[in-house]
Amino acid sequence: MGKLLINSGECIHKLYLYDGRLTCCSDDPRPRELGHPLAGGGTSSPQSSSNDLPTAICNKEIPQTIVVERDAKVDVVILIMPGVNCDIKLDVTLAGEGAEANIYGAYVCGGEEKVKIAVDMHHDLPHCNSRQLFKGIAGGKSRVDFYGKIIVAQDAQRTEAYQENHNILLSDDAKVDTKPQLEIYADDVKCSHGATIGRLNEEEQFYMRSRGITLEDAKVLQMISFISPVLESIVDVSQRETIAAEFESNIRNIINR
């Protein structure tokens, strides 16, 4: 796997989409890569329109290492559809003052998928910001492992770093193991981490059904709303809507199995 360098002053948005049309395994994950520059300039990978989404495949692996230099920003969005096994390891270093990195991820599993995600976020210098937000849905006999770590060096004062991993279980046979971690060696920081594993709220379902919404539609609404904070990080509106529709279709298939 490769290295992605975000040069000083650049703003980059990277979107990696794993779906069942791709052979995706631990030693050769090949997601579609869709990229756009963020507001403020910078460069990114070639753009793909929503019309390209069902068929366009860019055989670029997600980088294993990302280095963000002074006053640069990177947003990475990782989306994993049902039917995909993958092992994602991402090491991010904020290597210049004023650097920022945001890593977002959403995954939906409904069979016997095995999804592993490991993110290490290194704050080496002062005045840097990072956020990790991963939200997932696990059904069937799927297995999800999430390992996230924030490492704040002694010299990295005025750091702000946040990490969240939230999951919904759809079956008793699905398993989620989540391990958020903090290693802080500086004094003047704002850092937090958290993880949750729960079920769909039946009271919400009852409320929606009392207003004429079917149980299937109620569950779909709950799950799409659950992952929507990740989908909202997709800057291209047409891509966001197309991907949300693809997630909805896959979620309906899982419900109706």
Placement of each model-derived feature along the sequence:
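Extended amphipathic alpha-helical segments enriched in small hydrophobics
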Residues: Y207-S228
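Conserved beta-strand/loop scaffold segments within soluble protein domains that form the structured core
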Residues: M1-D28, D52, A56-F206, S210-I213, ...
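Short Gly/Ser/Thr- and charged-rich N-terminal loops/segments
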Residues: R30-P46, T55
